[in-house]
Amino acid sequence: MKNFQDKIKKLVPEMRRVNQIHFIGIGGAGMSGIAEVLLNEGYQISGSDIAEGPVTKRLAEAGAKVFIGHQAENVAGASVVVASSAIDDSNPEVRAAKEARIPVIQRAQMLAEIMRFRHGIAVAGTHGKTTTTAMISMIYTEAKLDPTFVNGGLVKSAGKNAHLGASRYLIAEADESDASFLHLQPMVSVVTNIEPDHMDTYGGDFEQMKATYVKFLRNLPFYGLAVMCADDETVMEIAPQVGRQVLTYGFSEKADYRIEDYQQTGFQGHYTVVCPNGERIDVLLNVPGKHNALNATAALAVAKEEGIANEAILAALADFQGAGRRFDQLGSFIRPNGKVMLVDDYGHHPTEVDVTIKAARSGWENKRVVMIFQPHRYSRTRDLFDDFVQVLSQVDALIMLEVYAAGEAPIVGADSKALCRSIRNLGKVDPILVSDTDQLGEVLDQIIQDGDLILAQGAGSVSRISRGLAESWKA
């Protein structure tokens, strides 16, 4: 391990006067990834979170000092404190650090420091960035380039969401939710799409959000590369403002890397990419949906422009196991009314839910789609209420869970009852509101039919609930 750390230090200068780094919210996907990379670089890592889980256990086993609960004394000995976006100035550890004159920085500022002496590839966008980051990471790994990667979700092929590589490459998911991606200084940036989300960060102004993406892309050096989705109207609107080399990808005839002849069979997608030089590349993709073909083509475009051979690109995509909680098959189960398939998916924005439903319809044409949906945040439910009503009305049967608040106070008219009422009034599906999740299995058994595909959809506790359901069904 020491020889590996010495190799890294030759590649990347160490942060002087920094010995111990403390993470508040260390169990979060993005925070844990950075902590793991820095731990493997040889820094002392400590951190706290409100609850113990698999991530905190793994970090503790790797050598991090992990505290459960936030206490002022937890920051003792820290050279710098990294706080997740969910942590505010009232946190006792933040207050203690500031009183002790210990620097308190955002997650993205630490990621930017890791990226500063590396060849950075940053993936941004409202949807698809976790999967696209994972795909690029696996392509570079397949090409024997041993990249460092920091992802916002599990890279299933690697079995983790972060890895410290011995090369100069760093592939990272860039977070627009708090505009902290502006700290990053990559060599290559990908923008998958831009839609209104996390609008509190941008004062409710979509124009401000678009301008922030332009600033992010202008962080590229003049010799950098922006890889942008030609199918997204907003992305194409800002492309002329970037002032850097831009390459596009998508189904659009105007795309530089153009997708043709997409077909889906079950979990696999088959299509052709036409490259800027006219080269045609036939792709077998091991995850379903046109949205994943877009993600994969963004990854392919980055890899081609960076000089990676087709063989490595195609092998990585054909073997890609997906990102955690992205159309994640939990299994097939025999229930009283027949055999069903249970899938867990993180999508919590109407566009994400829509593409998940479309992927299910394309790959399993003869199956009914039964959705267990848990709205995520009252503010998102309010801001995108009508879109949710339209999208959720596409399924054959709908079970609605209560809103996962994520720390927000309830908003009148933006709860699950209101969603159910509006969906019912549209007349396409009659939703069932399940407030007590202990009753979910019983309710499901009353409505499911032989051959159904059940989608557990959302970013909150619905994943834990659906996995618990799967375990009980296995028994």
Swiss-Prot record:
Any single GO CC term annotated in Swiss-Prot or TrEMBL for this entry: cytoplasm
Residue ranges that the Swiss-Prot or TrEMBL entry lists as coiled coil: none
Pathway this chain belongs to: Cell wall biogenesis; peptidoglycan biosynthesis
Keywords, ordered alphabetically: ATP-binding, Cell cycle, Cell division, Cell shape, Cell wall biogenesis/degradation, Cytoplasm, Ligase, Nucleotide-binding, Peptidoglycan synthesis
GO biological process: cell division; cell wall organization; peptidoglycan biosynthetic process; regulation of cell shape
A GO term, aspect molecular function: UDP-N-acetylmuramate-L-alanine ligase activity
Entry's EC annotation: 6.3.2.8
SUPFAM superfamilies documented for this protein: MurCD N-terminal domain (SSF51984), MurD-like peptide ligases, catalytic domain (SSF53623), MurD-like peptide ligases, peptide-binding domain (SSF53244)
One Pfam family this sequence matches: Mur_ligase
Binding residue positions for ATP: G125, T126, H127, G128, K129, T130, T131
Signal peptide: none
Primary residence: cytoplasm
Compartments, as annotated in UniProt: Cytoplasm
Reaction equation(s) it catalyzes: UDP-N-acetyl-alpha-D-muramate + L-alanine + ATP = UDP-N-acetyl-alpha-D-muramoyl-L-alanine + ADP + phosphate + H(+)
The family this protein is said to belong to: Belongs to the MurCDEF family.
Function description: Cell wall formation.
Database matches in HAMAP family: MurC
PANTHER family reported in the protein's UniProt record: UDP-N-ACETYLMURAMATE--L-ALANINE LIGASE, UDP-N-ACETYLMURAMATE--L-ALANINE LIGASE-RELATED
The name this protein goes by in its record: UDP-N-acetylmuramate--L-alanine ligase
